[in-house]
């Protein structure tokens, strides 16, 4: 294969059979359970990268079921996002993500810089309770529960929050191990069709684990919970800060 062909066809590895396809990346019936909790501000300050600023001392713990996603298939995800401000405007910083499907792990890390690791998240209904769990190997690291569709949420504020920008810290090393890419990336969700949004009583337990340290942002108080069903498109990102420049 000549160099020109390589340049024309190169998208992702392996060259002749990429681990994920090109977008657009559309999600149908994407289901969230989001439990918002108060944590230690000092712990947040240690992990939120400049130039982002903390908006509050809260974390949104998410369990996300994605049964129909373009190119990525059927999978589940769990992790933590942190409300922040960038140049005075609200958004969220994606701190940790654990999922059970290789293409979105590879694509998420390589294209946008999502902090994805392989694990075993589950989101399901147990009789009258929406239940989310996260296992890293055989070890339970998170359990979230919520009353199933107790109260309907106003769609306008839910949609507004879903349109806010998301931020990622993309890190890719050079072949000698030195940093080659270290960037703050911003991305959005678009073409959002909100099909339902509910709230109810919720509880969240996080357990210490050396390699899935979600409990490093401890739960001090659960302040809100939401259960959301929507269709949406994951847009490509843009670099807003280059730490190596």
UniProtKB/Swiss-Prot annotation:
Belongs to the ADC family. This is Acetoacetate decarboxylase. It catalyses: acetoacetate + H(+) = acetone + CO2. Keywords: Decarboxylase, Lyase, Schiff base. Gene3D superfamilies: Acetoacetate decarboxylase-like (2.40.400.10). It comes from Acidiphilium cryptum (strain JF-5). The lineage of its organism: Bacteria, Pseudomonadati, Pseudomonadota, Alphaproteobacteria, Acetobacterales. Its EC number is 4.1.1.4. It comes from the Bacteria. The gene is adc. The active site is at residue 116. Catalyzes the conversion of acetoacetate to acetone and carbon dioxide. GO terms for molecular function: acetoacetate decarboxylase activity. InterPro entries: Acetoacetate_decarboxylase (IPR010451), Acetoacetate_decarboxylase_bac (IPR023653), ADC_dom_sf (IPR023375).
